[in-house]
Amino acid sequence: MKLSELLEKYRIEEKFEVKNEKNFDTLALTQSDIRIPNCTFVDDKKYVGTLNDSVRMVLTTSEISRELDLNRVGLCIVDNPRNTYFKLHNALKDCLEYVRPTFKTKIGENTTISKWASIAENNVIIGDNVIIDDFVMVHANTTIGDNCIIRSGVKLGSVDFEFKRDGNEVFGVEHYGGLVLRNNVEIQCNTVVNRALYPWDNTTISEFTKIDANVMISHGVKIGARNMIVAGSVIGGRTLLGDDCWVGLSATLKNGISVGNGARIN
């Protein structure tokens, strides 16, 4: 994909200046751990040194552009890089080069699904020996492994809270990513686990993790194996939680932090 062509096609920016344009395949934040050639944005000088090797294009301001190495990345200079970036992300909702392909939902053997549950018709994979109780909602781009138990009222693969201010208006950001529950996960009543924002990313709950009622898990979170997460806990977006952790009653983990193996949070 070429940024100049996309900005013109979707009429996102009337005024922009491109230098040393390079092709890219997806969008990502500056420090995203991916190897896919991507376009990102930098609207603060403190992020200039955080670009990973997969970045090809950077949306940025005229002032910050002077701090970036044109030999390494291409630049697109705009007034508000953050808003331009997320408006482009939203505009690509029907772009087959960007979003995930569509397939019919697949359900494994010996799986029990309540007639009151709602399962998306497309882009869901449910393994063998799964139990899904009443009033569960499973949205597209969700994978549920074998031997999982999903109790009443759970919401899987929902859209998360991501909004941007734009003058006197506020716009929401589309979520094209997925949610993966690995084998032997149990989630109790009325918990919400949201899908990731980017099409290349998943919110992930690993093997044998048990999640209590009324827990909120945000987009892009990665939870390791054999964790126990107690009622009322909140885990902010893009947080990484290792294996064998305990997250106690009503604990809150802010977004973007990393917690090692065997941690105890109360």
Language-model segments: which ranges?
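Terminal amphipathic alpha-helical/low-complexity segments used for targeting or macromolecular assembly
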Residues: 1-104, 109-110, 147, 153-154, ...
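Structural signal for interior beta-strand "rungs" in well-ordered beta-sheet cores
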Residues: 41, 100-266
